[in-house]
Structure formats: C-alpha cells, structure tokens
Amino acid sequence: MMEKRRPVVCILGPTGAGKTATSLGMARKFPVRVINFDSRQVYTDFPVITAQPSPEERAVCPHELYGFLPTTETINASGFVDLAKERIDAAEAGELPVLVGGTGMYLQSLISGLAPIPDIPDEIRERIRKRSEEEGGPALYAELEKVDPEYCKRTHPNNRQRNARALEVYEATGKPFSWWHNREVPPSPYNFLKIGIKVDLDELTPLLKLRIEKMLEAGAVEEARKAWENCPDENAPGWTGIGCIELMRYIKGEIDLDETIRLWAKNTRAYAKRQLTWFKREKDIHWFAPHEYDKAVTFVGQWLAD
C-alpha cells in the first residue's frame, strides 16, 4: 500500500495581494506552521522593507524562514528546498505546513523537485563572482546564452545571482544548468494544495503605493540606513531587492525621497506583473479574491477531510 503523503498548503500570489492575511485566517481555524517562500523576506536587516510578518502576526502561529539571512549572503532554489523540507518534516503531527510567498522558482523547485547537482568547488564560485562584479550581469548572460540557451529563456540579463549559478554549474560539471533541471527526480513525499490570491494588476497598483507609504511610516528609511551602516556594499545580495535598491540610492544622495518612492512603486508594480505572469502558467491553482478568507479556509478544510 502506498504511504499517505503529508498535506502541505501553498498560498501564492503577487506582492501585496494579501497572502499573509489569508495564512493567518487559516491559522485561526487549523493548527498551522507558516513557512516562507519569498526570496526577499529571508533577510534579517529588512523586515519592514520586505514586508515580513509583524511580531503580532507571528504570535498567531509559528513562522519559519523569515529574517534569518545576513545581507552579505544569498540562497538559491536548492538551498531553499532543503530548508523548507526540514521545516515541513519538523512540523508536529496534526500541524498543517502552509507555505506563503511569491517566489515562483522556489515553489516550483519544491513541488517538482530538483535533480541533485554536485557541489561546486569554491575556486569556481569565486572566479564567477569576480567576473560578475567586474564584467556585469549582461556579460555573464551573453556567455550563458552560448552554453545554455534553454535556461536563458527563464532568467534575465540583470539577474546576476541566477546567471552566475548557472555558469558555475556548467563550468564545474560540463553540463548546462537546464540539463540538471530536466533530469528525472523522485516523487514528492508531500501532497500539495495551491491556493492563489487573485488580483487584477490595475486593482493592485494603488494598494502597492499605499503599502510603500505604510512602510515609510513604519521606519523603512531608518531600517535602510542601519543596514547600510552594517553592510555598505551595493553588490551585497540583500541590497538587490526592490525597495532596498531605491532606498540605498536615497541614502547615498543619488535621488530625493519623491524619486525614491516613484521608482519603488514603479519597480514593485513591474515585479507584481512578472509574478502574475508566472502564476498564470502554473497548473492546479485554486484562486480566491483577497477578501475571500473564509472561502479559502473552508476549501482547505474540505481538502484535508478528503
């Protein structure tokens, strides 16, 4: 007889859609353990700017993988999958793991699985890192197009971290990153239910602007100043996120506060648009409007009962 797989709920959607509120609605109905899958909310120095759950929200139920990474470090999809599996498996019997976030690559990697990639030698990592700093993201992307055009369809010329990782794997193994991704992987030990928060981009846009205003009121500028004192390196992974980049430029005197807010809102909207495009391609998502907490909770309850 096939062993019953552990149920795991995934709450996904674009930034600012109301994923945290939905997860807390579930936590008031079921014993829930919330696990982050947002690539920006992992950073210790940016709880306000990356909209991590507040202390009051975290008091409702256990929250995992928020604010644990220094600004100088990064985590790739493989590293996230390992940490997420640890947290899922550590959940107590009867406790429902609920993944919350908007980084589609992380979620896809957890659900679909990743083929095991050999460890990359430190000298290769360091060589690629130096090239990234000296030559810039577009130069790495141009090289990646020659050796792994398939993977280039899923990344962007300015995404230095992902492109550097792909080149590291190719240089270390002699095989494209996409080859490793396409390898057959063992079936997942988890039974996933994907709950999507459905919003229209035009409807979301004014909410994103309001969200930025609230972040500024909550001390986003002061948070960025303190982070810059601790890590005055604009190439550090933690500074590459939206909001962090714009506030860093403001702190350095490159732009005024009005321009900071304008760029922050513009870039957040563009990111939300990319997220919506990603999730539209995902299969088996059950969509609910932001205000439909009760419907989503009821649906999860029925799914668990089945």
Curated annotation (Swiss-Prot):
EC number: 2.5.1.75
Record keywords, A-Z: ATP-binding, Magnesium, Nucleotide-binding, Transferase, tRNA processing
Stretches the record annotates as Interaction with substrate tRNA: 38-41, 161-165
Role, per record: Catalyzes the transfer of a dimethylallyl group onto the adenine at position 37 in tRNAs that read codons beginning with uridine, leading to the formation of N6-(dimethylallyl)adenosine (i(6)A).
Domain of life: Bacteria
Family the UniProt entry places it in: Belongs to the IPP transferase family.
Protein name: tRNA dimethylallyltransferase
Cofactor(s), by name: Mg(2+)
Catalysis performed (reactions): adenosine(37) in tRNA + dimethylallyl diphosphate = N(6)-dimethylallyladenosine(37) in tRNA + diphosphate
GO BP, one annotated term: tRNA modification
Positions annotated to bind substrate: 15-20
Enzyme class: transferase
